[in-house]
Amino acid sequence: MTFYNKNINKKYYILRFLYYFAPRNTIIEMNHITDKELVSLFSTDKEKAFNLFFQRYYIRLCMYAVQITDDFSESEDIVQSFFVSFWEKKLYKTITDNLKGYAYLCIRNASLKFIEKREKINSNDILLNEE
């Protein structure tokens, strides 16, 4: 198995590197708090909880979205949109325990919508070229 795949953008590998070699203090702070504790932290200190949530899952969610879409920049947009809507719509109030599952499900659905849209655009381009 090779480390570098030419089909995936180089930024994906940079994200992977950052994930494995993130600053130690961030990793230590994140590892002491479970997802259930993080969910309960949203009721007392929303900003700290959101920052920890973002630090814990941003890179992982980007890597997950890239695996689905094969498009790094769009994957970043998908993940950023998720975090923005999570904060603005106060979705943290609706989650009771499975924060990780919720995040991955949202990213999967958004990534699949992107693929569906991309395929629709590509098929429309083919139809236009035939005419």
Predicted segments, located by residue:
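Sigma70-family region 2
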Residues: 43-44, 80-98, 117-119
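Short, intrinsically disordered, charge-balanced linker/junction segments flanking boundaries
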Residues: 126-131
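Structural recognition of an alpha-helix C-terminal capping motif at a helix-to-coil junction
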Residues: 63, 77-84, 97-109
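Short, charged helix-capping/linker segments at alpha-helix termini
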Residues: 43-52, 62-81
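ATP/adenylate-binding site constellation spanning eukaryotic-like Ser/Thr protein kinases
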Residues: 55-59, 80, 108, 117
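Arg/Lys-rich amphipathic alpha helix in sigma70-family domain 2
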Residues: 91-94, 105-125
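Hydrophobic side chains within well-formed alpha-helices
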Residues: 38, 49-50, 78-81, 99, ...
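N-terminal module of bacterial RNA polymerase sigma factors
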Residues: 2-60
